[in-house]
Structures are given as C-alpha cells and as structure tokens.
C-alpha cells in the first residue's frame, strides 16, 4: 500500500504510543465534555465511543452550547457469560453512573451503557475491573468480543466450545498497557527500543474491526457466516473434535457506493481443536499485512479475500499456520433464534431464556426488567448468558429453584408476554438518538413495526411461520440486516431500503427490493407478498426462500458481483 496515501487512522495509531495518545490529558480536562478528534478514534480501542443526544442537538446549538456529549461503553464478555455477582455490579453501574439508567444487550453477546458523562468513565471502568470485567478491545481495529453459542442443552459441548472462545479472546487481546495505565492507574513500565509491545497486532493494529464467532450446530444464533472469522464446531459422540473454519464475512456497506457490500464468509475446511489458535493468528496476521490501509470503506477482511482471491488467501493462511486445512466436515446449519422459556439440559439443570425487546433492560411501568434481573441475580446459583439475539438466559437453575426464578421473572414482566414467532426472531440496532451514524430510527420504532408485521401475518394466516426481520438506522449493519429475510436499512428519517431473500438459516444474503420508502409503502409491499406466500408457498418453505424462488428478488450467490447487480 506504499504507493497510496494511508487513511488518517493509520497515522493516528502509529503516533499514539500504542493507543495512549492524549487520552489521559483529555480525560482530565473539564473545559469540554468531549475528547479531541484523534483521541475519539483511539478511545474505541479502550471500549467506548463519543456520542451526543441528537434529539437535543439543534436546541443546544441555538443556545450556543456544545452538543450534549456522552459516551457509549461496551464490555468485553466472550461468549456472553457472566456470574450473578458480576451482573449485580453491572446493574449498579447502570443505575448510578449513566444518564440512560439502562443496560443494552448487544447483537454480539455483551452489554453496553449509554449516556455516560466523561467524568464518570474512569469510575465505571474501575468498577467493572472490580467485577473482573473490562472493555479492552470491545471496539477499534482489533479482534472484538468473541461470540459463542450459549447452547443450554448440550452443556458439555457448550463448555468445550466456550473454552475455545474464551481462549481466542484472551490470546488476541492487545498487549499494550495503555488501558491499565489510563483507567486503572497502574504504573507505566519502561520498555526498550526494540521490545515487541504487540507481537500479533504490531504498531498499527489491524486495518479495521475484526469479528469472530464460535457456532455449535445446528444452532446458528451467532450468525457465523457474517463474521470475519468463524469456527463451526464439529462433534463426535458429544465431544468437540474440531471446527469448520469460515472467513470473510461482514455486514457493513455504504449507501450508493457499489464497491462496498455485505458478504457472507467462505468455507475453508476443517481444523483440529489444537490448531485453532494457529489458524486464528494466521488469518488475523494475513489481514494485518494484506488488508487495505488506504480506504477504510474497503479495509475489512472480506475485501482482502475478494481482492487477493480465495486460493491465494487460503495458501497464505496455511503457510503461516504451518498446518493444511482438511476437507470440511458435514454439519447442519439451522435456526438462528433462541429457545424461549424453560429448557432442560443434559446435565439435569434448567435454563430460562427471557425475551428482551431490542436488548434494552430498563424499568418501565408494568415491565420492571432491570429490577427483575437484579432480584434474580441476588438468589441465582448458576450464570447469566447473553445471546446474540439480544436476549438473556438464566442458566444452570436447579429443579427446586425453578418456581422461585419463574415467579420473579413473571412479577417483573420478564415472562408472560405474548411472543410471536417473528418477534422472537427479530432484532434492531440502537440508532437514534445516540448513534452518530444513524440516518433513521431503529430500536425506538422497531416494536411498533413488528406489531404491524404480526398483524399482516395474522391477516394472511401465516403467524406460525417465523420470519427473520432486522432493522438498522444505517448500512453499517450492526443488527446484521443483510442476512435477514426482511431487512430494513435506514436511508433518511422515516425512510428505509427494503431487502428481501436471505435464507432463514443465515447462509444467503438478501437483496434490495425497494429503495428509500416509507412505512406505508413497506407494509403495502409486505401485505402483497404475505398474501402470495400464504397461497403459493411450498410445504416447509421459508419466506426468504419463497421470495427468491418466485422471482421477487434474485439470489445473491457472489456478493461482490451480484449484491448490487
């Protein structure tokens, strides 16, 4: 990339002294509620983003005030598992140190806080540290939170898969001590000129974000093919023997720029469990060395594979890993949803999956979700498992404790709501008012939109059919809308692009059907299509497959060539 000018972020990383920048000085300044432009990029590596309340932006401008700056902090919780004691700490932070007084479960199996004033950042990070939690590398050009199927039934297999996810997360953490020095007040250690501070990442880290997931078939709740790097567990007689490795997935794109596109990962082959770290490091270092550092819109691993070619990339990964891929093993990729209600595991323990609409845990009249989870955490002896569908599993409940846990869940509105198949399979990103990238609503509007979808399905007698519906406020794709049977991507206030045709299992992308349309047009279009689907569908045919089969949209086979075509 020496012939091209590097992206600004590359210079920022190079000059940052391994992610220190002037964050400490900015934190100490009370003149403004923000950080400098450069530090706003660096703080992402520490786990948070600078935001402002866009609902108040114009009003404050008229008053000649700076925007109402706040921060969104995202924790690193590999596999989404935390203890009840940790959850109580997480809850206390939300209640005392954020203006949102809420916890947001994310589509990557962790939680985030919104509405943090700059003065509270350090206190929050130190409080998380006391709970053995952190936000290191939850954002930024590094390996993000590692997802893992929270399968509450195959407990032994889940334990083995989770151990791999946890090891991946720990092994691929940045080594810089910037986080410990700035936020935890640890002493800066003296280093020599030739000392390797970041043995995997190097001084400029990765060209762009890097997302990783471990799936346990037949479940695909982690949407493994949408990740930069995926590991699909292969078991024999209930024991983990290895993984099918996938690489090159990613959701983000830019409206109107056809050289950007979402993409599902390629299958590369089977690897043994003992070789996982070799291959993970090999894939990451190829991306580190080959990835585009001039154009951040084309810097994800998916573009590296497209630009260099599958075979060339595969050969380089094998060379760096020192191991060849074996032929991919046969596995069945199935449902992406969660199992709601009580499920008994093979170990005799029970697991209660609670639906949390759009992942927002907050006390509201008639639904005191935050208090309910707090009360459960006080007595629960198992663990809490966050899912990539923004839900919560109260896992490892003894049979004799079921009634007490269920009673608390019902008392606080965590159980008892009527949940349609489609609502249970649908997710939305945060969007307005806090996300600076949002062009339209998502989380705040989504429940009402799903009400309309439910009504249309009932009208046409297809309520029993789960349809994966996802909404985002922009095309960056945090809620993985391009892998939804019905995807809505914000284009402007109240206007969305409508995408159709993804597979129910997450093995095929969707394609744009209508551009820049409002709610009335979206619902009219879906009303017509649901009517056709009710009459014309084959036995067992999902909605996404139906829209492709009857020619409503063309199947996306090679995203680089036909997502936009």
UniProtKB/Swiss-Prot annotation:
Alpha(8)-beta(8). The alpha component is a flavoprotein, the beta component is a hemoprotein. The gene is cysI. NCBIfam families: CysI (TIGR02041), PRK13504.1 (NF010029). It catalyses: hydrogen sulfide + 3 NADP(+) + 3 H2O = sulfite + 3 NADPH + 4 H(+). It holds the Pfam family NIR_SIR. Siroheme binds at residue 478. HAMAP family: CysI. Component of the sulfite reductase complex that catalyzes the 6-electron reduction of sulfite to sulfide. This is one of several activities required for the biosynthesis of L-cysteine from sulfate. It comes from the Bacteria. It comes from Shewanella sp. (strain W3-18-1). [4Fe-4S] cluster binds at residues 429, 435, 474, 478. SUPFAM superfamilies: Nitrite and sulphite reductase 4Fe-4S domain-like, Nitrite/Sulfite reductase N-terminal domain-like. Belongs to the nitrite and sulfite reductase 4Fe-4S domain family. GO terms for cellular component: sulfite reductase complex (NADPH). Pathway: Sulfur metabolism; hydrogen sulfide biosynthesis; hydrogen sulfide from sulfite (NADPH route): step 1/1. Its EC number is 1.8.1.2. Its cofactor is siroheme; [4Fe-4S] cluster. This is Sulfite reductase [NADPH] hemoprotein beta-component. Binds 1 siroheme per subunit. One of its GO terms (biological process) is hydrogen sulfide biosynthetic process. It is an enzyme of class 1 (oxidoreductase). Keywords: 4Fe-4S, Amino-acid biosynthesis, Cysteine biosynthesis, Heme, Iron, Iron-sulfur, Metal-binding, NADP, Oxidoreductase. PANTHER family: SULFITE REDUCTASE [NADPH] SUBUNIT BETA (PTHR11493:SF47), SULFITE REDUCTASE [NADPH] SUBUNIT BETA-RELATED (PTHR11493). InterPro entries: CysI, NiRdtase/SiRdtase_haem-b_fer, Nit/Sulf_reduc_fer-like_dom_sf, NO2/SO3_Rdtase_4Fe4S_dom, NO2/SO3_Rdtase_4Fe4S_prot, NO2/SO3_Rdtase_4Fe4S_sf, NO2/SO3_Rdtase_FeS/sirohaem_BS.
């Amino acid at each position: 990339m020496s012939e091209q000018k590097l992206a600004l972020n590359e210079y920022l990383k190079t000059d940052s002294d391994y992610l220190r920048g002037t964050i400490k000085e900015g934190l100490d300044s009370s003149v403004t509620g923000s950080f400098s432009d450069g530090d706003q990029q660096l703080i992402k590596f520490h786990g948070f983003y600078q935001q402002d309340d866009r609902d108040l932006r114009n009003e404050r401008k008229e008053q000649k005030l700076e925007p109402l700056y706040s921060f969104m902090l995202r924790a690193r919780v590999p596999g989404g598992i935390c203890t009840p004691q940790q959850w109580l700490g997480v809850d206390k932070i939300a209640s005392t140190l954020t203006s949102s007084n809420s916890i947001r479960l994310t589509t990557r199996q962790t939680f985030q806080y919104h509405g943090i004033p700059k003065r509270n950042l350090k206190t929050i990070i130190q409080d998380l540290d006391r709970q053995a939690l952190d936000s290191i590398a939850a954002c930024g050009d590094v390996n993000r939170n590692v997802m893992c199927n929270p399968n509450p039934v195959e407990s032994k297999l889940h334990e083995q898969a989770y151990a791999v996810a946890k090891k991946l997360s720990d092994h691929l953490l940045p080594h810089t001590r910037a986080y410990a020095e700035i936020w935890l007040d640890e002493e800066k250690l003296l280093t020599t000129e030739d000392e390797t501070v970041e043995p995997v990442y190097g001084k400029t880290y990765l060209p762009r974000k890097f997302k990783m997931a471990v799936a346990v078939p037949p479940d695909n709740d982690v949407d493994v093919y949408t990740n930069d790097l995926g590991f699909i567990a292969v078991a024999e007689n209930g024991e983990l023997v290895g993984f099918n490795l996938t690489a090159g997935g990613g959701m983000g794109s830019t409206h109107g720029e056809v050289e950007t596109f979402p993409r599902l990962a390629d299958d590369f082959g089977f690897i043994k469990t003992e070789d996982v770290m070799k291959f993970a490091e090999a894939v990451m270092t190829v991306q580190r060395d080959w990835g585009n550092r001039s154009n951040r819109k084309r810097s994800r691993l998916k573009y590296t594979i497209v630009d260099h070619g599958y075979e060339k990339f595969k050969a380089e990964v094998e060379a760096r890993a020192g191991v060849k891929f074996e032929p991919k093993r046969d596995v069945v990729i199935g449902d992406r949803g969660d199992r709601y209600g009580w499920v008994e595991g093979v170990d005799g323990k029970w697991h209660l999956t609670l639906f949390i609409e759009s992942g927002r845990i907050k006390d509201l009249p008639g639904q005191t979700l935050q208090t309910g989870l707090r009360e459960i955490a006080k007595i629960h002896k198992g663990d809490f498992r966050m899912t990539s569908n923004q839900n919560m599993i109260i896992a490892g409940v003894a049979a004799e404790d079921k009634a007490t846990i269920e009673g608390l869940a019902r008392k606080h509105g965590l159980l008892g709501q009527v949940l349609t198949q489609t609502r249970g399979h649908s997710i939305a990103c945060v969007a307005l008012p806090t996300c600076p990238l949002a062009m339209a609503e998502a989380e705040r509007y989504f429940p009402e939109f799903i009400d309309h979808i439910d009504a249309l399905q009932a009208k046409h007698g297809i309520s029993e059919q789960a349809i994966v519906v996802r909404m985002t406020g922009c095309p960056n794709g945090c809620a993985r809308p391009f892998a939804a049977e019905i995807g809505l991507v914000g284009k402007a206030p109240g206007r969305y692009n409508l995408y159709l045709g993804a597979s129910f299992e997450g093995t095929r992308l969707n394609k744009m059907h209508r551009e820049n349309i409002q709610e009335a047009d979206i619902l009219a279009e879906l009303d017509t299509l649901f009517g056709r689907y009710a009459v014309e569908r084959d036995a067992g045919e999902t909605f996404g497959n139906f829209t492709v089969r009857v020619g409503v949209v063309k199947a996306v086979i090679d995203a680089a060539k036909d997502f936009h075509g």
